[in-house]
A protein has these predicted regions:
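Beta1-alpha1 glycine-rich phosphate/pyrophosphate-binding loop at the start
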Residues: 1-23, 27, 108-154, 162-164, ...
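Generic detector of intrinsically disordered, low-complexity, polar/charged segments
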Residues: 2-4, 14, 69, 76, ...
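Generic secondary-structure boundary/loop-capping signal
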Residues: 3, 8, 12, 78-80, ...
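FAD-binding core/adjacent interface of flavoenzyme oxidoreductases
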Residues: 20-111, 186-190
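A Rossmann-like FAD-binding core segment of flavoenzymes
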Residues: 28-54, 129-190
């Protein structure tokens, strides 16, 4: 995330996403903490032996004094969301869309519908708009937004992006590429 708004609690100043991450990277470097990127943990034994692997070292073990599980998050797939229809190109998770725009410099679409009004969905609506996309709607299954009020104002209201609460995607049209979606209102009873 390249927008600002990070660091207020931790560093007592407003930072962009890269600046915020940079502060933590500097702390790790200053403290001499060993770290391994692109590494997968295969096993953690009861006596704290961590078996891991990566391309550089292959399979290896680390004897740990303590183990802290900080595994990040994994986005739910479209299948886990029970959205019917084909799986055409042009449908992305929020994390993939963020990576494409922020790191790869690639716009995933010109006309966008965002499902989910948590802070990531709201911020991506603004980001896609700033990059030239037309965000047609942000749809939210719940009768309220999961995002901060300030993000609703700064990311949707300031850009005239509509928010449809109690709505979800019930169909995806298109076989090769997404051609459209169908939204439906939900009533809380399923």
């Amino acid at each position: 995330c390249i927008h600002n708004g990070f660091g207020l609690h931790t560093f007592k100043e407003e930072l962009t996403g890269p600046e915020y991450a940079g502060r933590f990277i500097k702390q790790v470097m200053d403290l001499g903490i060993e770290y391994k990127l692109h590494t997968m943990v295969m096993d953690i034994s009861s006596d704290k032996i961590v078996t891991a692997m990566n391309r550089e070292e292959g399979l290896f073990e680390i004897q740990a004094g303590a183990v802290i599980l900080a595994m990040g998050c994994r986005e739910r797939s479209r299948g886990a969301l029970n959205i019917p229809g084909y799986r055409p190109a042009g449908i992305y998770s929020a994390g993939t869309a963020q990576r494409l725009v922020n790191m790869e410099g690639y716009m995933p679409g010109r006309e966008v519908v965002i499902l989910g009004s948590g802070d990531i969905g709201l911020i991506m609506a603004r980001r896609m708009t700033l990059e030239g996309a037309k965000v047609k709607v942000v749809a939210e299954l719940m009768p309220y937004s999961g995002g901060l009020k300030r993000n609703i104002v700064q990311c949707l209201n300031d850009y005239d992006i509509p928010l449809k609460l109690s709505h979800t995607v019930v169909d995806i049209k298109g076989k090769e590429r997404v051609e459209g979606i169908t939204l439906a209102e939900v009533d809380g009873k399923g």
